[in-house]
Amino acid sequence: MTLHSLASMTLVTLLALAPAAAHAAHLKEQPRRHRVVYHLSEAGVDKARFVLGNIHNTISGVGGAGNVEAIELVVHGPALKTFVTAGMDPQLKALLTEVQGQGVVFGACGNTMKGFSLTLDQLPPGAHPLPQGGVVRIMELVEQGYVYLRP
């Protein structure tokens, strides 16, 4: 093999690898931004605290809210009564306020609200009613590529 052919092969190899190297460098520069939907339907303060703790840990685990595109907590069924502000557990309220401050959306099932005769003003500030229902909202988010978690 001549020096000229060796140099030509080296050049061809480098040109072939350049796009892969550029793609790998781009991935390092652009951290993945996560989209997650959390599903809560079980009643009880302990369960709600556990789920909000999971949300907090998710945000911390990916390096902070800057690496999260969206997290939505969809609450329906008996779990929604846990979030009625009159008599709401203070620690639960503080946890919810903390994760909402990091961009977490609190979605309240419209069917559950109707079934339990709840109004939006009875729920924590920032709660979003889901008129189509909590399960339908979860389905829509999963279809949009959200990771589904039900701790």
Where are the regions that the model predicts?
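Short internal beta-strands
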Residues: 71-76, 107-110
